[in-house]
Amino acid sequence: SLFELGKMILQETGKNPAKSYGAYYCYCGWGGQGQPKDATDRCCYVHKCCYKKLTGCNPKKDRYSYSWKDKTIVCGENNSCLKELCECDKAVAICLRENLNTYNKKYRYYLKPLCKKADAC
């Protein structure tokens, strides 16, 4: 769910997930279209594509369990869809941390209509 995703992003990046990524560039937050604009935006693009591959669960609402061991996210679900959902969220949180150097505050509230149509998963 969005709750676990936000928690993972905070743990990995140290940033407030809603404030920092809730409307960042073209793909972070709701919606998404066009070419990802930087490495941070590409993390969110890949995450949206990961969600599109899931069947049998609701990425925004369904809760899953994970643990934080030695600064590492460990997904712990028996249900395959919830496990995959956790892995999608884990991947984006790690990607955002690895690309903190590309994060630019000026794109925090980017107008999505400025993102040109294209790039589908």
Swiss-Prot record:
Protein's name in the database: Basic phospholipase A2 homolog BaTX
GO cellular component: extracellular region
Gene3D superfamilies, per database record: Phospholipase A2 domain
Region named Important for membrane-damaging activities in eukaryotes and bacteria: 105-117
InterPro entries: PLipase_A2 (IPR001211), PLipase_A2_Asp_AS (IPR033112), PLipase_A2_dom (IPR016090), PLipase_A2_dom_sf (IPR036444), PLipase_A2_His_AS (IPR033113)
Segments forming a coiled coil: none
Keyword vocabulary terms for this entry: Disulfide bond, Myotoxin, Neurotoxin, Presynaptic neurotoxin, Secreted, Toxin
GO term, biological process aspect, one: venom-mediated myocyte killing in another organism
Its job: Snake venom phospholipase A2 homolog that lacks enzymatic activity. Is myotoxic and displays edema-inducing activities. In vitro, produced time-dependent, irreversible neuromuscular blockade in isolated mouse phrenic nerve-diaphragm and chick biventer cervicis preparations. A model of myotoxic mechanism has been proposed: an apo Lys49-PLA2 is activated by the entrance of a hydrophobic molecule (e.g. fatty acid) at the hydrophobic channel of the protein leading to a reorientation of a monomer.
